[in-house]
């Protein structure tokens, strides 16, 4: 994280790729992996000078035996120089603005990422703009002048984005300033910023221009766009149009106590085997929750219509489901709300709520309330509360879903009687729905008994003795669990003669809790947050204890891993500072699957989910180096992905898996 510059912003994260791309270097450069070169990439926070000093003292004292006092003095000098540099930049921005006023010049704020200052990347765009007689400023040089009205429609959680929004807000107040945003291919976070910056400017009558640049050194298209902008500005000047400067803040619709009584709450599907149990749990608490059943192709098509197409593939699926349901005509939209979860982390998933609100506004339904379900206090609604009863019902449902998934996927490929595994699942599903759908406080004794009985019944299901390759499925959480997003990969693997192994959904929640340990130890988070989250982990493990013990005693199942063990397995390949997206947890899952004998792994990599490319695809080389028998394939999922290409790559992995299995058996 950065030092907080804007107190009203939601958070102050750094870019997820800036925080983690060094891991790709560490795990893929031969000179480093072979030990020829020393490579240090400690995770550090620029929250304040003390937090930064502590990390650098630990690093340089351990690696180079530099005295603590010397390191702290160096950090202090660097911190002062950083503040001075920023101040000089702001003064220069004010000088340029004054020059524009005195010489009646126009200015262009060239807003981009820090690397866009590099001539090799911007291809000379600043010089081209000045050749037209205009001044060029960076967003950093004027962001301190923009008194941005908050809250925004987006989650303002990345520090660099906060500067972009503030700079755009200042530009809208001046007739002699315009803004051009530079956007590089693959920068998925700019799917959030480009929309928000555009809104800030266009709502106040300004023209928004975005230039997409990549490694191609051809400025023809950029020159045309800039000349078009200048022509449009001249036309507006001749018309002497008066602009109304509008505030940038967004007033969200609150979900009230009255709404709770008769509103239908639409929640997007993520994991059918879990969510079909969560629905009755929420209804028992008085919420009319519905999960729309939307075909996969329709999800994508509708998502592309309502979401910035540079956004990640999971966001298209989520918003596509919601908007398909909203536009279906099945619901009274005057009594409809949307429910979405937010982790509060640096992943763009925290901004899905902004995507949803923008899509609803675009479709003409801005009055539909969007409810955030989160544990970090991001948004609150009087009509939706996580009561102890709802938490109990929901967690029981989640744990039952994990048991069903673990048991069903393990026995179904080997069932002696076709359909018997699904029939057993349906039988127990009805009992679980009746149990978690009870409006009273649930019996923990009965819950424990049901967990044990489910595992025993699946363990005793008649199974064949054949051996099939076990294939783990990991990746981004939605693509991993949602069949519509992963093209029904579990069904595909089973039809091709393999057994699918999908890690528990609860593990992701434990990963979110465990992250507080690293944050408290190295990134300046409070010891209190660490204690609270470790208590939550112990609570989750208490809930899972009976299931874990029964799985350990069974003939066919492995017990669930402890989150601490996953972290220990992962941290020799990636740092536990990787906490964006699935972070170190994704690497840990792959290593745990290999330890359990599922050496064949499909790693689902959705479009624009760049952090997962670092901790997923980016660690495959190192995992193969440590485990030569690992058979891992990374499968890309995006709106235009060819299912044939995905199928071919999976079949190639399976053919290798079958060969390896024959060698093992022989």
What does each model-found stretch correspond to?
Residues 1-666:
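An N-terminal assembly and electron-transfer interface module characteristic of large anaerobic redox
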């Amino acid at each position: 994280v950065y030092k907080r510059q804007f107190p009203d912003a939601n958070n102050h994260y750094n870019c997820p790729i800036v925080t983690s791309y060094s891991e790709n270097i560490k795990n893929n450069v031969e000179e480093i992996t072979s030990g020829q070169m020393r490579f240090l990439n400690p995770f550090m926070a620029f929250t304040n000078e003390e937090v930064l000093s502590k990390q650098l003292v630990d690093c340089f004292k351990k690696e180079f035996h530099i005295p603590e006092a010397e390191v702290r003095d160096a950090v202090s000098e660097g911190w002062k120089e950083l503040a001075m540099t920023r101040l000089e930049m702001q003064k220069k921005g004010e000088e340029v603005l004054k020059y524009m006023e005195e010489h009646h010049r126009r200015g262009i704020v060239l807003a981009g990422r820090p690397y866009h200052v590099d001539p090799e990347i911007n291809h000379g765009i600043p010089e081209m703009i000045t050749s037209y007689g205009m001044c060029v400023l960076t967003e950093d040089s004027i962001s301190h002048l923009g008194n941005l009205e908050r809250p925004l429609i987006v989650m303002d959680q990345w520090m660099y984005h906060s500067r972009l929004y503030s700079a755009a807000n200042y530009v809208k107040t001046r007739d002699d300033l315009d803004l051009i945003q530079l956007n590089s291919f693959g920068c998925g976070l700019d799917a959030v910023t480009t929309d928000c910056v555009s809104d800030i400017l266009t709502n106040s009558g300004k023209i928004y221009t975005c230039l997409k640049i990549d490694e191609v050194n051809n400025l023809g298209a950029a020159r045309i766009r800039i000349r078009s902008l200048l022509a449009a500005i001249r036309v507006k000047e001749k018309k002497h149009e008066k602009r109304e400067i509008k505030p940038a803040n967004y007033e969200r619709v609150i979900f009230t106590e009255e709404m709770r009584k008769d509103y239908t709450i639409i929640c997007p599907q993520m994991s059918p085997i879990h969510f079909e149990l969560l629905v009755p749990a929420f209804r028992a608490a008085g919420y009319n929750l519905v999960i729309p059943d939307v075909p996969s192709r329709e999800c994508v098509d509708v998502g592309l219509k309502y979401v910035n197409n540079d956004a990640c593939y999971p966001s298209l699926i989520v918003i596509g489901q919601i908007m398909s349901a909203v536009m279906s005509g099945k619901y009274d939209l005057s009594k409809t709300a949307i429910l979405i979860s937010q982790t509060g982390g640096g992943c763009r998933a925290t901004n899905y709520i902004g995507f949803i609100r923008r899509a609803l506004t675009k479709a003409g339904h801005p009055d539909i309330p969007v409810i955030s379900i989160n544990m970090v206090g991001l948004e609150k609604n009087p009509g939706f509360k996580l009561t102890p009863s709802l938490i109990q019902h929901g967690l029981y449902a989640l744990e039952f879903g994990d048991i069903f998934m673990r048991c069903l996927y393990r026995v179904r490929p080997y069932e002696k009687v076709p359909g018997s595994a699904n029939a057993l699942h349906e039988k127990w599903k009805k009992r679980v729905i009746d149990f978690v759908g009870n409006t009273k406080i649930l019996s923990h004794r009965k819950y424990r008994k049901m967990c044990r009985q489910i595992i025993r019944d699946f363990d005793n299901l008649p199974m064949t003795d054949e051996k099939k390759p076990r294939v783990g499925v990991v990746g981004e959480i939605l693509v991993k669990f949602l069949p519509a997003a992963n093209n029904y990969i579990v069904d595909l693997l089973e039809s091709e003669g393999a057994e699918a192994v999908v890690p528990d959904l609860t593990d992701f929640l434990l990963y979110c809790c465990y992250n507080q340990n690293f944050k408290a130890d190295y990134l300046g988070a409070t010891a209190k947050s660490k204690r609270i989250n470790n208590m939550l982990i112990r609570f989750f493990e208490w809930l899972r204890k009976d299931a874990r013990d029964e799985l350990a005693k069974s003939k066919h199942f492995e017990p669930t891993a402890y989150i601490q063990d996953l972290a220990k397995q992962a941290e020799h390949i990636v740092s536990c500072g990787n906490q964006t997206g699935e972070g170190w947890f994704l690497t840990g899952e792959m290593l745990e699957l290999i330890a359990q004998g599922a050496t064949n792994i499909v790693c689902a990599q959705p479009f624009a989910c760049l952090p997962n490319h670092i901790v997923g695809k980016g660690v495959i080389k190192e995992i193969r180096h440590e485990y030569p028998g690992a058979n891992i394939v990374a499968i890309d999922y995006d709106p235009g992905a060819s299912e044939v290409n995905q199928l071919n790559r999976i079949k190639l992995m399976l053919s290798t898996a079958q060969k390896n299995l024959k060698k093992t058996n022989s």
